[in-house]
Structures are given as C-alpha cells and as structure tokens.
Amino acid sequence: MKVKTRFAPSPTGNLHIGSIRTALYSWLFARHHNGKFVLRIEDTDLVRSELISIDSIFNGLKWLGLNWDEGPYFQTKRLDRYKEVINVMLEKEDAYICVCSCQELEEIRKKQIEKGNKPRYPGTCRNLNIKNISNQNHVIRFKNPLFGKVKFQDKIRGEIVFDNAELDDLVIQRSNGMPTYNFCVVVDDMDMKITHVIRGEDHISNTPRQINILNSLKVKIPVYAHLSMILDEKGNKISKRKNAINIIEYYENGFLPEALLNYIIRLGWSYGDKEIFNLSEMKELFNLKSITKSSSTVNFKKLLWMNKYYINNSPLDYVSDCLKNYMEKKNINVEKGPDLELLVKLFRSRHHTLKEITESCRYFYEEINFFNHTVIEKYFTRKNCFILQTCYKKIEKLSIWDNKNISKIINDVSELIKVTKKEISMILRISMTGDICSPSISTVILLIGKEKALLRINNVVNYIKNL
C-alpha cells in the first residue's frame, strides 16, 4: 500500500502551532514511508474563509520546508464533483431530500431538550422519497444506518466505538446548494486515495459519520490517528480564531524553521529522552505509536532555548544567510556594515532569536540619532568629553586597524589621563552603539571601521559641548 497523507486546513483563521503539528506529523509519516503528502484547502465555509488565511497557510508551510507532492486542491473548485456523488447517492437511496423548515426543526429540538434527550433529526423525510420539490427550500441528508455500531482502530487511542442510534441523518448539502464539510472530506479522501488521516481529536465525533458515508460509497476506510489538543501556557485550548499566534509571527520574531519544527514535533511525540532532532532524524524515527494521548502545553521558554541551540549549533554560513534575509526584511542594508558571519560569531551566544541579534547590531548599519535620557545625565560629562577627544586623536593616527591595536589605545589613554579602562570603554561603547551594553568594545570599534568610529566619537563630543 502506497502511503498518502493530507493536510487539509480551513482558511478561517491563523495557521498556528496546532495546525502545523498536524501538517508536520502527516508530512513526516508520508516521508518515512516514501509516500505522498497532499495539501487541500477546505474553503466551503464561504462566510469565514479568507484569502489572507490561504496566504498564511502557503507561506507558513513553505517557510518550514513542508513541501507538498499534490495540490493545493480547493474544495470550492470541486463543487461539480460533490454534486455528482450526491446524485449517485440519491439514486441509490443512500441520501434523501429533506424539506423540514428551520422553524420545524427548532421546535423539535426544543422538545427533545425539554425531555432530556439529545437533540437529533427524527427522520421525518427519510422515507418520503421526495422527488418534485420545484423551488421549495430543502437540504439533502445522508441516510445513516439505524442500527449497529461504527468501529475503527485509532492508531493513537486504540479501538473507538459509536452506536449508529446516536448518529442522526447528516446534512450533506445545504439549502443554498453548498455541500457540507463532512461530506466534502469523504469525497476528497476517496478521490485523492488518502490512506492515513492524521488530525486533531476534535474530529473524533466526525469520524463515524464519515466512515458510514465511505461505506455507502463502497470505498476502503483510511487509517485514522487523532492527536490530542495543544494548550497555551494558561492551560486553554489553542483556537485559531482566539488565542493562536500565526506561524509567520514566529518568523517575524526571529525563529529558525528547524528550531520550530524540532519544538513542535516534541508536542506529543517522543523518542526516549532525545530532545534535538534534525529533519533527517525526524523522517527516520517518526512513528504514530509514540504519540501520546495526553494534551501538550506550549512552553515559550523551551522554544527560546531550542532556538538558541539551533542558532549556536547550525552551520555559520546558514545562520548568516538566515540573518541576512531577516535583516533585509527589516529594511536594513547589510552592505553598509561588517561581514555577517563575523557578527553571528560575536552575537549568537548572547541571544535567543534573529530578532534579538538584529536589534543588538543595528548600530553597525544605521547611524545613532538618539540617546537615552539616563545615559545623557550620567555619562555625557566634561570628563568623558575629554576622554573621547583623547581617544579620537589616538585612533586617528592608528595605521594598523586590528583588535590588538584598538585595545592598546584604551590602555594607553587610561595611563595617559589617569582614568580607568572601564570608564573609557563605557563612553566609547555609548558613542559607538548608543547603549551601555555590547560585546568587547575593541571588537565593536574594529567592525564599525575607522572612519565611522571617528565620526561617532566626534558626534558625541559635539553633543556634550552643546548641552
């Protein structure tokens, strides 16, 4: 059997960590078995479907490298096919026309609730064999079996059983002519020859209905694996329309795709005590048996730790390329500063994300036009002005531009004017970076370059003089 999985999001909200976990597990399972991974957009909810959400799905999957082998298929482009299958089911009397009004159904529902019964369609039109409906509003319902049980072996949860008596006759076509979610899914899985359906546990209740429709169509039932929910840090279920972070925001916040995938795979799956998995290891080791039934909770600190690990342990040229792309997206001209590999070496052990690195090294690429009020009050003094003027003269005369000679200037100025190297380094740091924290100041000055370093010292000297 050729394995074929699918990721079938509805474009009605953000593509979030829960969605990506479903996509990742489906993708890995297909890759592990040398199968195919299908992308399908379930967009029949015309009211809530959004183009921006479709873009989010495509961009998120591409950024993470979860390439698809078939698709993207759009359900709204398959409406004729759904109608064709519905007509076959009507002819076989596996489906029927229902003319019950919304008002009638609501009255029935209220009475059932008053009696303490589960609300369900009573089958009013089931055996009426309605054919001539002219322009009368109607829906089409699937004729669900009245007796027996629906059993399926969930790859994560074991055997799950539903009683057909608990399932009512599902609407498969709405009064506006649009097919419903549960019906479209069945036809799509049938036509696309999906062998394994990996999805969230909120779909467990849909599964018996879908199996019954598949049985009526005489189609082989796929293997099901229902993933437990992912909770946010407050213990709430992540919902794409409420508390979910769009997956692209992780890119905006400077996360590496490998780090995010490694973090997400561990939200419900494990391989002993191993924490770090590269993509090849994920494809080799992933299996459905090791997925837990318990809910997983997002831990942002763990994600930051994971991202820092990848920034520090991925090849230098790769991290530099990622940083270059990130900085260019932030409209920073990387040609105006030092080689990015030098900056990655200098900064990656200090930070968790590309965003943090970018914010920490902007001064290499952009001029400093603002100084914090506290910095001005504490450090912009006549004494420090004199220190800077002395450093300026020494740096201006420096012929060999290297770290050793820049460090020597700081030592020489310290001895010459009897101030500590710490004081000299601090005012130089503020002049170069606009901040009181940075890597080694001699290294910073080296990377900024002689011309720009002299200009910045001169700017601060003039600033102090004009106070």
Curated annotation (Swiss-Prot):
Domain of life of the source: Bacteria
Swiss-Prot/TrEMBL catalytic activity: tRNA(Glu) + L-glutamate + ATP = L-glutamyl-tRNA(Glu) + AMP + diphosphate
Motif ('KMSKS' region): 237-241
Localization: Cytoplasm
UniProt-recorded Gene Ontology molecular function terms: ATP binding; glutamate-tRNA ligase activity; tRNA binding; zinc ion binding
List of residues binding ATP: 240
Biological-process GO terms, alphabetical: glutamyl-tRNA aminoacylation
Chain span(s) of sequence motif 'HIGH' region: 9-19
Matching InterPro entries: aa-tRNA-synth_I_cd-bd (IPR045462), aa-tRNA-synth_I_codon-bd_sub2 (IPR020751), aa_tRNA-synth_I_cd-bd_sf (IPR008925), Glu-tRNA-ligase_bac/mito (IPR004527), Glu/Gln-tRNA-synth (IPR000924), Glu/Gln-tRNA-synth_Ib_cat-dom (IPR020058), GluQ/Sye (IPR049940), GluRS_core (IPR033910)
Entry EC no(s): 6.1.1.17
Swiss-Prot/TrEMBL keywords: Aminoacyl-tRNA synthetase, ATP-binding, Cytoplasm, Ligase, Nucleotide-binding, Protein biosynthesis
SUPFAM superfamilies: An anticodon-binding domain of class I aminoacyl-tRNA synthetases, Nucleotidylyl transferase
Similarity remark: Belongs to the class-I aminoacyl-tRNA synthetase family. Glutamate--tRNA ligase type 1 subfamily.
Stored HAMAP family: Glu_tRNA_synth_type1
Subunit details: Monomer.
Matches recorded under NCBIfam families: gltX_bact
Name used for this protein in its record: Glutamate--tRNA ligase
Source organism of the structure: Buchnera aphidicola subsp. Acyrthosiphon pisum (strain APS)
